[in-house]
């Protein structure tokens, strides 16, 4: 069957701070990262800020997502595509402080628990620039060696703004 988007993060097994059991445990991932680093290789972690429909955030924090008047999720659209297996995060939610703290905690979890030093960020240009400035700034206070790589196929002006926000 259709397993959905690889960027539709989370399932009934957990969210952004978990691994799917079919892919191994957190301990397995830590071992992978350590072995790679022992060989002089850095593992770049994908940092995709959206959720699968069965992500725990959707049930526990519905205010972190945009909803249509009929109660259905306002899916991300990138014409001609409609990403109906991805629920975009609403960065300007009334509960934005708790949302942003959680997103910071996600990044710090992988840095501090698994020694991740490189993030490949999915479509950062589709999220508020001021969020990235804040998030990257907070992480760099404790972990100045962490790199943020922008996966952004966009105009040079936008890429320049992402660089100003802390992307490498």
Name each model-derived stretch.
Residues 1, 43-47, 120-121:
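Short beta-strand segments at enzyme active-site cores
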Residues 3-9:
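Surface-exposed intrinsically disordered loops and tails
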Residues 9-12, 19-23, 27-30, 34, ...:
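Alpha-amylase-like alpha-glycosidases and glucanotransferases acting on alpha-linked glucans and related
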Residues 16, 46-52:
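Active-site beta->alpha N-cap acidic-glycine motif
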Residues 37:
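Catalytic PLP-binding core of fold-type I/II PLP enzymes
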Residues 40-43, 148:
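Hydrophobic beta-strand scaffold residues
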């Amino acid at each position: 069957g259709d397993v959905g988007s690889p960027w539709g993060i989370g399932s009934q097994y957990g969210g952004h701070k978990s691994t799917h059991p079919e892919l191994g445990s957190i301990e397995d991932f830590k071992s992978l990262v350590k072995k790679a680093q022992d060989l002089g290789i850095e593992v770049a972690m994908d940092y995709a800020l959206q959720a699968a429909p069965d992500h725990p955030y959707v049930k526990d924090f519905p205010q972190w997502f945009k909803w249509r008047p009929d109660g259905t999720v306002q899916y991300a659209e990138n014409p001609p595509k409609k990403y109906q297996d991805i629920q975009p995060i609403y960065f300007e939610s009334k509960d934005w402080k708790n949302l942003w703290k959680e997103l910071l905690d996600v990044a710090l979890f992988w840095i501090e628990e698994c020694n991740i030093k490189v993030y490949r960020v999915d479509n950062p240009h589709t999220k508020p620039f001021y969020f990235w400035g804040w998030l990257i700034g907070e992480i760099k206070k404790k972990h100045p060696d962490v790199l943020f790589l922008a996966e952004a196929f966009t105009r040079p002006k936008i890429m320049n703004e992402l660089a100003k926000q802390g992307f490498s």
